[in-house]
């Protein structure tokens, strides 16, 4: 006999589906838990990376003969080419004139970082394929030469771009831009005499991530609403993560170059310099920012280099948190959320989540990260750190990360329950 064989109910976090957590004992399903959470969430995966919900808002991502509209009468033929996934689902676009191809007009959030991507392959003379979004005040498109595999030009709105050679003549071309409206036009245009294959179009908030196939509706992957979270934080074995409702009050939690984050200086200090999306973050994608704080030759507490954001609040206990590392060595920074005393943190070359909990007494509070000189302050004159995932929440401890864009985001409480369990647990 063993504890396992004697047990009337055993739940080993492993089997689950939407709104359900399976129990190992009994095996007839009578003890399975009903799960609910009316919002998306995040979790730590078995590989140690944070998994967020990702959404491809482009419809019919592999069929350009359906939802997609045509511009300047191209000839679009479905399923002519072996796609990067090995299926014959790549479509061919034969352009008939200038900017001839397919387009789609999805709805997006205004003023938010988005990334487009699509796989393309040269068939005939495809040296100037126009790919991108946002045919508005700030254009977010680029020109790609599918013969050479190079981006030749980028429009003013592009903040970053990349090309990945995935083999067999296919390239994944992507670009990042800030939306300037709520409707953007995703374009894949060629020029007269060009023929090229296309497959796997994607548009998503944030930076480019792994491809998500769609048909008649947008598709989200990750810990979506109603899906239980098996979390591996601090362990090689998962646990069923059940958390209370929390709201991240810090907006643009990963986009520190956004105007939602103030940058300031005092005395000999310099305004922090921010380079967006140039480091791999704890979620495994290149969406962490590098921030350089510098107070120059100053030695007093008036010499400050800082970035900040006002988050409101009430008279209560709040917890701030952030992920940070250096490229090499260590650096000291100071953080406060109560508008008063700074907490000092030593940042190393490994990603860590740092937290601070304070009792706040007002309704206009500030998350501030800085270098400040003085007798009782860190004495490094500058610090270069990689930053990601700032969170400010009402509560005495930090919960799992809640990503935000232009507004605060609430993760609804997890709940797992089993009714009529008396026969199982006596």
Across the structure, where does each feature detected by a protein language model lie?
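Extracellular and organelle-lumenal recognition/adhesion modules and their flexible linkers in secreted
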Residues: 1-426
